[in-house]
Amino acid sequence: ASINPGQTDSLFLTTPFTPTVIGTYNVAKTFAADSTDDVPANNVLGANFSFDVTNYIYARDNGVANGYTDNGTDLFQAGNFYDIWANQSVKGVDVRFATGTPVGSEVYARIHKIDPVSGDIVYVGESAVISLAAGQINTNITLLLTSPIQMESGVTYFVMVGTYSPNVRISTA
């Protein structure tokens, strides 16, 4: 394929990669062309990266809490979408509440799935509402679900943490 000057394009994997063993996987991005590039310095592939495969954690996290999102004085929920590749049972949601979150804030975890046929968002389950103690702020905690949720292969889930309290800060990494 040819890309004309000033145009952009995207590259996609034709064969998906599924890790087969527990460990760290390193991803290096490279590009090769059969023509001379006039300005190779403007080719952007993004940084190389690595990810870990573990027995029990599926996370979107770089391991360094370096910011937060908050709700000001409003109720809110924040989370991520997760594609599930094998049937799994989930028992809790890990989260970190940033410094400045008021002690006593009421928080919870909730999980929805995207119906693969209709595209509707369907409630699946949640944790009990807890009141945050001082020792639960600026540290990773697990919000245990009221009962385990069986996640289905091939389904996308929206895993979120929410609050009924003002000024709650959910760490970002």
Where are these regions (language model features)?
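Beta-strand-connecting loops/turns
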Residues: 6, 22-23, 138, 152-154
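Terminal connector regions
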Residues: 18-51
